[in-house]
Amino acid sequence: MISKPDKNKLRQKRHTRVRGKISGTTETPRLNVFRSNTNIYAQVIDDVTGTTLASASSLKLTGTKTEQAAEVGKLVAEAAKAKGVEEVVFDRGGYLYHGRVAALATAAREAGLKF
């Protein structure tokens, strides 16, 4: 019997492959996105020191999932700019650049982050 491929395992493989090629530095940290079934999380990470500089999530937000993602993008961009971060490397976490991930990225760009 043919078994259905586990989408999350495939996503994790993509994410691991991409993480081997990109990393955040102190000057240009990494904007990481995690998307669950109900929420979306974003954090700005300095991979050299292994610290999270800014983060935001949709845990307490209301509206559609896409609207929540856009609000998270705006919030994480504002938090990053408050820490002095202007430019980041976007890490979509193995997810397709579509829907909620694209909405988060667009809102972060509009709020002033460069990537």
UniProtKB/Swiss-Prot annotation:
InterPro entries: Ribosomal_uL18_bac-type, Ribosomal_uL18_bac/euk. Keywords: Ribonucleoprotein, Ribosomal protein, RNA-binding, rRNA-binding. Residues 10-20 have a biased composition (Basic residues). The keyword RNA-binding applies. Residues 1-24 are annotated as: Disordered. One of its GO terms (cellular component) is cytosolic large ribosomal subunit. One of its GO terms (biological process) is translation. One of its GO terms (molecular function) is structural constituent of ribosome. Transmembrane segments: none annotated. This is one of the proteins that bind and probably mediate the attachment of the 5S RNA into the large ribosomal subunit, where it forms part of the central protuberance. Part of the 50S ribosomal subunit; part of the 5S rRNA/L5/L18/L25 subcomplex. Contacts the 5S and 23S rRNAs. Belongs to the universal ribosomal protein uL18 family. This is Large ribosomal subunit protein uL18. The gene is rplR.
